[in-house]
C-alpha cells in the first residue's frame, strides 16, 4: 500500500515538522502583513500576472495529498519545494530594511525545515544521491517588483505549507 512506510516515520519527526510548518506560516503571515501595512500590497491575486512575467515558479506537492499519499515522493516534493522557496526568499534580499529581519527569520526557518526533511530521508534511505540544485530564480529589477514578489512568494509558500501540513497531519494519525 502507498501508506506502508508512512507508519515507520517517527512521531517525534512528524510533530517537529508540524511545529516547523506552523512557525513558517506565522513568519510568512508577518511578512504579508508588513508588506500590506507598509507598501499597500495586500492582495496576492492582484499580482498574479506580474508573478507570471517575473517568472516566479511554484512548487508541486501532489504526492502529499491524502488520496495519493506516497511517503518517499511526498518527502521528496516537500524537500524540493522548501529548497525552491529558500532560493526565492534569497532572491528577495534587499526588499527593504524594515522587512529584512522578518525575511531572514523566514529563510532560516525554511532552511531548518528542509534540513529536517532531508535528514529524515537519509534515515529512511530514500534521499537522492545528490542534493537538488537551485534552478533559475527571478530577477527583481525594481523595489516594487521585489515587494510584489515578496507578497507572491509569501502567498505561494502559505499555500504550499497548508498542503504540507495536511499531508503531515494525515501521516501523524495513528
From Swiss-Prot:
Membrane-crossing residue ranges in chain numbering: none
| Glycosylated residue positions | 133
GO MF, any single term: cytokine activity
Q: Which Gene3D superfamilies match?
A: 1.20.1250.10
Would you name any one GO CC term?
extracellular space
- Where in or outside the cell? Secreted
Q: Which GO terms describe its biological process?
A: immune response; positive regulation of myeloid cell differentiation
Q: Which residues form a coiled coil?
A: none
Mention any Pfam family matching this sequence. Answer: GCSF
Chief location of this protein within or outside the cell: secreted
- Which protein family is it in? Belongs to the IL-6 superfamily.
| Protein name from the UniProt record | Granulocyte colony-stimulating factor
Q: From which source organism is this entry?
A: Ovis aries
High-level lineage:
Eukaryota, Metazoa, Chordata, Craniata, Vertebrata
- Protein's gene: CSF3
Amino acid at each position: 500500500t502507498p501508506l506502508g512506510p508512512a507508519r515507520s516515520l517517527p512521531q517525534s519527526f512528524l510533530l517537529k515538522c508540524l511545529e516547523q510548518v506552523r512557525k513558517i506560516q506565522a513568519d510568512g503571515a508577518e511578512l504579508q502583513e508588513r508588506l500590506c501595512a507598509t507598501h499597500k500590497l495586500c492582495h496576492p491575486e492582484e499580482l498574479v500576472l506580474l508573478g507570471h512575467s517575473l517568472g516566479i515558479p511554484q512548487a508541486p506537492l501532489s504526492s502529499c495529498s491524502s488520496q495519493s499519499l506516497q511517503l518517499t515522493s511526498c518527502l521528496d516534493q516537500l524537500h524540493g519545494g522548501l529548497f525552491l522557496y529558500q532560493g526565492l526568499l534569497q532572491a528577495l534580499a534587499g526588499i527593504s530594511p524594515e522587512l529584512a529581519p522578518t525575511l531572514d527569520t523566514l529563510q532560516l526557518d525554511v532552511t531548518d525545515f528542509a534540513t529536517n526533511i532531508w535528514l529524515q530521508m537519509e534515515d529512511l534511505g530514500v534521499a537522492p544521491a545528490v542534493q537538488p540544485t537551485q534552478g533559475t530564480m527571478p530577477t527583481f529589477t525594481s523595489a516594487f517588483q521585489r515587494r510584489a514578489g515578496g507578497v507572491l512568494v509569501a502567498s505561494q509558500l502559505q499555500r504550499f505549507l497548508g498542503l504540507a501540513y495536511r499531508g503531515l497531519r494525515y501521516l501523524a494519525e495513528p
